[in-house]
C-alpha cells in the first residue's frame, strides 16, 4: 500500500467513538443482577460548609462532657490531689473553654484569610494569640 500525505483538518472538539468489542458489548447490554449501587457523594467542601452553618446556629456544647471532665480532673491533680468538683463548676469551665476556643478559631481563620489561604495553620494560631496579648 502506498503512503499518502495527510492533510490538516479542523477538529470537531470531541473524541471519535470507538468500536466496542463483542464481549464488552455483551457485558454492557446484560442487566447486572448483583450490582451494588454506588453511594451518593457530595462535592468536596459541601458537607464542611453544611457543618459550619449547623454548628454556628447551635448552642449546645461541642466537646463531650465525660472526656472533658476527665481532662479537668487530670490537670487539677497536678496542683492538688483529691480535689472535688461540683457538676455546675465543670459545666461552667466547659462553657468558657468552648467559648474561648471558638473565638480563637475565628481569629485564626481571619489570619489565614489575610495570608490569602483557606486552610488554618499553627502560625495563624500563634499570630492570633500574639495579637490578643496572650503570648509571652
From Swiss-Prot:
Protein name: Histone H3
Organism of this sequence: Neurospora crassa (strain ATCC 24698 / 74-OR23-1A / CBS 708.71 / DSM 1257 / FGSC 987)
Subcellular location: Nucleus; Chromosome
Keyword Cytoplasm set for record: no
Stored InterPro entries: Histone-fold, Histone_H2A/H2B/H3, Histone_H3/CENP-A
Residue numbers of N6,N6-dimethyllysine PTMs: 5, 15, 28, 37, 80
Phosphoserine found at: 11
One example GO MF annotation: protein heterodimerization activity
Annotated region (Disordered), positions in chain: 1-43
PTM annotation (N6-acetyllysine): residues: 10, 15, 19, 24, 28, 37, 57, 65
PTM-bearing positions, type N6-methyllysine: 5, 15, 19, 24, 28, 37, 80
Subunit structure: The nucleosome is a histone octamer containing two molecules each of H2A, H2B, H3 and H4 assembled in one H3-H4 heterotetramer and two H2A-H2B heterodimers. The octamer wraps approximately 147 bp of DNA.
Coiled coil: none
Function as written in the Swiss-Prot or TrEMBL entry: Core component of nucleosome. Nucleosomes wrap and compact DNA into chromatin, limiting DNA accessibility to the cellular machineries which require DNA as a template. Histones thereby play a central role in transcription regulation, DNA repair, DNA replication and chromosomal stability. DNA accessibility is regulated via a complex set of post-translational modifications of histones, also called histone code, and nucleosome remodeling.
SMART domains to which the protein is assigned, alphabetical: H3
Biological process annotations from GO: rRNA transcription
Assigned GO CC terms: nucleosome; nucleus
Gene3D superfamilies the UniProt entry points to: Histone, subunit A
Protein family per UniProt: Belongs to the histone H3 family.
Assigned keywords, A-Z: Acetylation, Chromosome, DNA-binding, Methylation, Nucleosome core, Nucleus, Phosphoprotein
Lineage: Eukaryota, Fungi, Dikarya, Ascomycota, Pezizomycotina
Disulfide bond found in the keyword field: no
Pfam families, per the entry: Histone (PF00125)
Modified positions (N6,N6,N6-trimethyllysine) in chain numbering: 5, 10, 28, 37, 80
PTM comment, free text: Phosphorylated to form H3S10ph. H3S10ph promotes subsequent H3K14ac formation and is required for transcriptional activation through TBP recruitment to the promoters. Mono-, di- and trimethylated by the COMPASS complex to form H3K4me1/2/3. H3K4me activates gene expression by regulating transcription elongation and plays a role in telomere length maintenance. H3K4me enrichment correlates with transcription levels, and occurs in a 5' to 3' gradient with H3K4me3 enrichment at the 5'-end of genes, shifting to H3K4me2 and then H3K4me1. Trimethylated by methyltransferase dim-5 to form H3K9me3. H3K9me3, but not H3K9me2, marks chromatin regions for cytosine methylation. Methylated by set-2 to form H3K36me. H3K36me represses gene expression.
Amino acid at each position: 500500500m502506498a503512503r499518502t500525505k495527510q492533510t490538516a483538518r479542523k477538529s470537531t472538539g470531541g473524541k471519535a467513538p470507538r468500536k466496542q468489542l463483542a464481549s464488552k458489548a455483551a457485558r454492557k447490554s446484560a442487566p447486572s443482577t448483583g450490582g451494588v449501587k454506588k453511594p451518593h457523594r457530595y462535592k468536596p467542601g459541601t458537607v464542611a460548609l453544611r457543618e459550619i452553618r449547623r454548628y454556628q446556629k447551635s448552642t449546645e456544647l461541642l466537646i463531650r462532657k465525660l472526656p472533658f471532665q476527665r481532662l479537668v480532673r487530670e490537670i487539677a491533680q497536678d496542683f492538688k490531689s483529691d480535689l472535688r468538683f461540683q457538676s455546675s463548676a465543670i459545666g461552667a469551665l466547659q462553657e468558657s473553654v468552648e467559648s474561648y476556643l471558638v473565638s480563637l478559631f475565628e481569629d485564626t481563620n481571619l489570619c489565614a484569610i489575610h495570608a490569602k489561604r483557606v486552610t488554618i495553620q499553627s502560625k495563624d494560631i500563634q499570630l492570633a494569640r500574639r495579637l490578643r496579648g496572650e503570648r509571652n
